[in-house]
């Protein structure tokens, strides 16, 4: 399940569980489905799902607001709704930046941020 630009599907997750855990393919599929269903059920109830060293899935309530139709420019009411948000953990962010193509950009951005914080603190 490594590589860049690839989409990992349920089938891929089931296969990884099958290969790494040693469950049968049927059991692996049932396991993955059970985990995804539990996450979905919690989010439907408005609960936050926090997975240590991975991140948090949370539901936010967005209020009604006025938007614009980009073609006509007319105002359009946007109904209140709930949206799901994923907030990655600091550990996951570090792993992505260490292993991804954005690592060089992140390092230079972090270095620049470090320079600013050092000059602000007087060190």
From Swiss-Prot:
Region named Disordered: 97-123
GO molecular function (one): structural constituent of chromatin
Self-association and partners: Heterodimer of an alpha and a beta chain.
Compositionally biased spans, kind Low complexity: 102-113
Family stated for the protein in its record: Belongs to the bacterial histone-like protein family.
Gene Ontology biological-process entries: DNA recombination; positive regulation of metabolic process; regulation of DNA-templated transcription; regulation of translation
Organism: Rhodopseudomonas palustris (strain HaA2)
SUPFAM superfamilies assigned: IHF-like DNA-binding proteins (SSF47729)
PROSITE patterns: HISTONE_LIKE
Keyword Transcription: yes
Domain of life: Bacteria
Signal peptide: none
Record's GO cellular component terms: cytosol
Designated name of the protein: Integration host factor subunit alpha
A Pfam family it matches: Bac_DNA_binding
Translocase in keyword set: no
PANTHER family linked: DNA-BINDING PROTEIN HU (PTHR33175), INTEGRATION HOST FACTOR SUBUNIT ALPHA (PTHR33175:SF2)
Keywords carried by this UniProt record: DNA recombination, DNA-binding, Transcription, Transcription regulation, Translation regulation
Functional summary from the UniProt entry: This protein is one of the two subunits of integration host factor, a specific DNA-binding protein that functions in genetic recombination as well as in transcriptional and translational control.
